[in-house]
């Protein structure tokens, strides 16, 4: 029945979900009679039933949901509504549950999380920021812990051991940033015990549209220092001023692209003294040339960037702010530095990357929650195979959505906004003002200060403090100015948010749901009636004033973001109102049909301070938003189309890497690699002609670079050891060389073990294979990026770029694997090996005042001297050191989507942002540059 349910139409799906909720209701009476211990015992009962194999999760779902509903009532004093039961069932079936703001998505997620955690494979609940992950793990975790499940949270400050413990919990909360980078780091680990994740079973993504759609254009990238190419940046910065537009290259200012023509190519070839710029060996030079021309023609000093203290800083096009720590990607920033004759900062090299699309598609089952997914239903289905199920509201929506008001100038618009807010403030109505940037929110704040209107400003930077402001944004006379993305995850409840106010009061008393759970639970139930009474009394006054008024100061390019803002008002059947104030200077109006509207207003001869309300304008705005949404969808599809090629290669490499990491004895794998390499060499030498035509001298010369060859090819031909003298077949040659290589490998193993002890060769094999695979993979990522950059030109030759990219990428991948094998054999035979110094004993020292401090100091000393403290779970590394293999870890840079829709950069260890950028970093920023929207504010 349940499998059929997913194939039904939307209306029938909702009807079936209602059936699930009704069934859960029939179980409630029996569940309510259970004691706390009996309720908790249900978890073990469910697990036993599932382990028996006769029932699956679908079978136990109704009873499990009834148990969770009762536990939530006893612990949180919150009982799931029927619509929340419906939402929980939709999530369990692997859908996106579209639940309007205020309908209790967080509480809904407890249902499928508990159910899917029963098999013990782990459930990940993904939030948009760490504050929400921590808050939900604490509050919703109270229900799970009451039922006997382990709950933990992944935070950026955790150590690898703490992360491993968190992932081993039944339910793990975290951000897409932390989960994605843990996956990449696991596939860079040099020891199995350094891996932290344990698989991808089931994920529930909160704000699924934001994470899987808005942030999906920016891949997660880990990068490290690369070899610098500053000389080439300088050389092309010298050439660019000598080249002329329309002679050597074409410039499209609107699309922000440049194209080098034939005369330009010839000019560069003459200047550099090379025959063909487009030869494979010269392919990197094309990128330097393009960036030099872009830096010259498309980026103006003091407009797009400024130079201060010998550094180039990007300027935000919308806010005019200097973006400290942000750099253009793909070598463009270095080209601008060369143009301005300042120090050229090193470019970073990508060492690992994955798109959010491909990360989340690894989960066996994926589900999501949001208040606004209907406009993106097609994309969610096409890319993630997720259906969108609109869940009915618990109470009818009575919010009034007023028509947009359009003003001719931005100044007139903001004057009208302030007047409207002042009028609402006088009667005590709470107002939430949505802006599109920090600069605009601060501008409004200054206007309110001039009018002496008390208010709060939210800029999506300090989530914990902002959650407190949002929790009180529905109180009498509260005026809140917020960027569109600020304060997500906290309900604006008329009169104040009971849960938040109660939690704050308990924390002020020193109580914590994790540190002091029993006292916290007791205090919760004691204080709850008082807080509820206070909030209810104030809510009556707020309702009398008209409820929450949401005022948008600009239309977002996505209808979904506008709907999110509107959805903050009118929750749970409360009264409310919303309106957008627009001007012809707004970004969306400028990009689409702004001139037409301006002509209309001019003909009407209306004063600047008189707005118009016209259906034509509303239609134009909707049309513009639809166009932008489609453009962004196409961009994401294009990213995914090319990344799918890399994804298949990534799977192969990471699977091979995992086998190496997990393999106790790699002798068999090393032997096969040795045979493959010898076979490839022999095939290359014997591919053409008869044996007398083979260049065995060249073959032997190549083999001697790999291992100490112990036989002579003349002896093979002249003796009858492998057949008739003078007659040498390819098979005879191959078998003789394989036998010789095996002899040499056995001798090498004896040599290594004499130096570093028994088992040292196995350790060397693991170290070499991991090191070489990682290095060749990094080089491959670099080459694939170059291929991706230039592949678009294949369209001019009537070829499909994505097909050519897949074909050539496959050839490059096979070549990379062959190179990895060859290099590994060379390292295994030739790397210098010595015994690593044994772990020194920690010198005795006087214990500091605190025993914990003493233990920490001793552990730190041991860590510094041995590279890690040996434990039962993590034994000490063997006594082997290989030159060029066991190098120190390089500082890493992490690049991924930020919550405000831009790109965020972090250094390993939580340091300052990187001063360099990879060629792939901030891919979304590059696209924004091409469409006239430069790198956004962090």
From Swiss-Prot:
Topology of the protein relative to the lipid bilayer: Peripheral membrane protein
An annotated GO BP: intracellular protein transmembrane transport
Reactions performed catalytically: ATP + H2O + cellular proteinSide 1 = ADP + phosphate + cellular proteinSide 2
Annotated EC: 7.4.2.8
Region named Disordered: 865-938
Keyword Mitochondrion attributed: no
Keyword line: ATP-binding, Cell membrane, Cytoplasm, Membrane, Nucleotide-binding, Protein transport, Translocase, Translocation, Transport
Binding site for ATP: 84, 102-106, 491
Keyword Translocase attached: yes
GO cellular component: cell envelope Sec protein transport complex; cytosol; plasma membrane
Compartments where found: Cell membrane; Cytoplasm
Biased segments, Basic and acidic residues type: 918-927
One GO MF term attached to the UniProt entry: ATP binding
One Pfam family this sequence matches: SecA_PP_bind
Cross-referenced SMART domains: SecA_DEAD, SecA_PP_bind
Enzyme class, broadest EC rank: translocase
Oligomeric and partner information: Monomer and homodimer. Part of the essential Sec protein translocation apparatus which comprises SecA, SecYEG and auxiliary proteins SecDF. Other proteins may also be involved.
Free-text function comment from the UniProt entry: Part of the Sec protein translocase complex. Interacts with the SecYEG preprotein conducting channel. Has a central role in coupling the hydrolysis of ATP to the transfer of proteins into and across the cell membrane, serving as an ATP-driven molecular motor driving the stepwise translocation of polypeptide chains across the membrane.
UniProt-listed HAMAP family: SecA
Family assignment from sequence similarity: Belongs to the SecA family.
Protein name as catalogued: Protein translocase subunit SecA 1
Protein source organism: Mycolicibacterium vanbaalenii (strain DSM 7251 / JCM 13017 / BCRC 16820 / KCTC 9966 / NRRL B-24157 / PYR-1) (Mycobacterium vanbaalenii)
